[in-house]
Amino acid sequence: FDFRNQLIKSELGDTLAYCYQCATCSGACPVAQVTEGRYNPRRLILDSLLGLKEKIFGPENAFNIWGCTMCDTCDEVCPQKVELTEIFIILKNMSVQRGEAPEHYTMQASTVLETGKAIPMQSAIERRRGQLGLPDVMAPDVEEVQKLLKATKLPEKLPKKEE
């Protein structure tokens, strides 16, 4: 139960122990509905309560954590006011520390770090904006974005690029 206690003692995970497994969160979760239960916040909370790291972490279990879109629906409907989204953030951060973040997340983060944007502007979009009379999209201040991301230690959390 060391893992469970670590979660409960964390700044954001102290409401974990309030969960009585009513499954209201899973019933309201849009991801659980779309994935026909493959993503299941109640199960993730249960595995956390039981300290079952092997069911939470590892490449084969990545969707268990990373399927959450942080919409906060589960937090809104929980009768015990368990801060599920905050607990899922803790689990995602642990996953990153273990080097288990899904590749598409780390690739997206690398793109933001390098360019200041999550999605680069495409010429077709620029043309269409011009046709609609919309102003040009301002380029981000890449140095400012990098400064902010370095303050959060993002570069240290990304996989090292092979040269």
Predicted regions and their residues:
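Cysteine-centered iron-sulfur cluster-binding motifs in ferredoxin-type domains/subunits
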Residues: 15-32, 62-82
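Iron-sulfur (Fe-S) cluster-binding modules
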Residues: 1-15, 97-163
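Aromatic-residue detector
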Residues: 3, 20, 31-32, 45-47, ...
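Well-ordered, non-transmembrane segments within structured domains
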Residues: 28-33, 44, 156-163
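Ferredoxin-type iron-sulfur electron-transfer modules in oxidoreductases and energy-metabolism complexes
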Residues: 1-11, 35-65, 81-119
